[in-house]
């Protein structure tokens, strides 16, 4: 059994994935840690404080371990994984997510790009394109780990979640775009 838990940074992937793997007695794999430990990246982006992954190498190495494993895989890149029984996309209210990421001390550009990705549903769309009806979206806003886990185990999906129906979120997206645009010369 392969379960993918995905979503933008700050939505609760790590805690939910670890708890899910423990509850279902499955192994846990953080794709980010896997990439770093196996040097499956091409460079380090100083501006965003992130590694740029080598997608081909990641896919190749994942194939070696997925075929014979029962895993919960935590990732922001669901389409790099070739197979899954369930894909859980954790989502979070963009305003809450912004506060979460700012609280981590991340650079403004990194916060803005990640919150924009959440608003636009980038990871959700990627998951749906790769896994279609195996996708379950869960809104983690103001939820405990136990509540999130319960929704996953009972396949109580909230999605597809559309943040852009809220005019406040639309205005927030415009502000995020201004932040991102201010870094254009650095990108």
Curated annotation (Swiss-Prot):
Q: What is its EC number?
A: 2.7.4.3
- Name of one Pfam family that matches: AAA_18
Q: Where is this region: NMP?
A: 30-53
Query: In the UniProt record, does the keyword Transferase occur?
Result: yes
The top EC class, named as a word, is: transferase
Q: Which residues bind ATP?
A: 10, 12-15, 104
Q: Which UniProt keywords apply?
A: ATP-binding, Kinase, Nucleotide-binding, Ribosome biogenesis, rRNA processing, Transferase
Keyword Repressor in the entry? The reply is no
Catalyzed reaction equations:
AMP + ATP = 2 ADP; ATP + H2O = ADP + phosphate + H(+)
**Biological processes per GO annotation:** ribosomal small subunit biogenesis; rRNA processing
Residues of the region (LID) are 103-113
* A GO MF label: ATP binding
Residues folding into a coiled coil are none
What quaternary arrangement does the UniProt entry report? Interacts with uS11. Not a structural component of 40S pre-ribosomes, but transiently interacts with them by binding to uS11.
| Biological function | Broad-specificity nucleoside monophosphate (NMP) kinase that catalyzes the reversible transfer of the terminal phosphate group between nucleoside triphosphates and monophosphates. Also has ATPase activity. Involved in the late maturation steps of the 30S ribosomal particles, specifically 16S rRNA maturation. While NMP activity is not required for ribosome maturation, ATPase activity is. Associates transiently with small ribosomal subunit protein uS11. ATP hydrolysis breaks the interaction with uS11.
HAMAP family with a match to the protein in the record = Adenylate_kinase_AK6
Give the UniProt family note: Belongs to the adenylate kinase family. AK6 subfamily.
Q: What is this protein called?
A: Putative adenylate kinase
Originating organism? Saccharolobus islandicus (strain M.16.27)
């Amino acid at each position: 059994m392969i379960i993918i838990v995905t979503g933008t940074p700050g939505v609760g992937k790590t805690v939910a994935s670890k708890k899910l793997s423990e509850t279902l007695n499955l192994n846990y794999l953080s794709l980010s840690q896997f990439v770093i430990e196996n040097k499956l990246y091409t460079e380090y982006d100083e501006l965003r404080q992130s590694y740029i992954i080598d997608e081909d190498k990641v896919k190749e190495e994942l194939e070696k371990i997925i075929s014979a494993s029962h895993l919960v895989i935590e990732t922001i890149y669901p389409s790099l994984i070739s197979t899954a029984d369930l894909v859980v996309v954790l989502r979070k209210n963009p305003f809450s997510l912004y506060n979460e990421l700012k609280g981590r001390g991340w650079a403004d550009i990194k916060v803005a790009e990640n919150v924009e990705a959440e608003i636009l549903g980038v990871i959700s769309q990627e998951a749906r394109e790769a896994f279609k009806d195996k996708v379950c979206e869960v809104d983690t806003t103001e939820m405990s780990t136990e509540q999130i886990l319960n929704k996953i185990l009972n396949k109580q999906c909230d999605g597809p979640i559309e943040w852009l129906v809220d005019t406040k979120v639309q205005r927030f997206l415009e502000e995020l775009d201004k932040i991102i645009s201010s870094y254009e010369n650095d990108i």
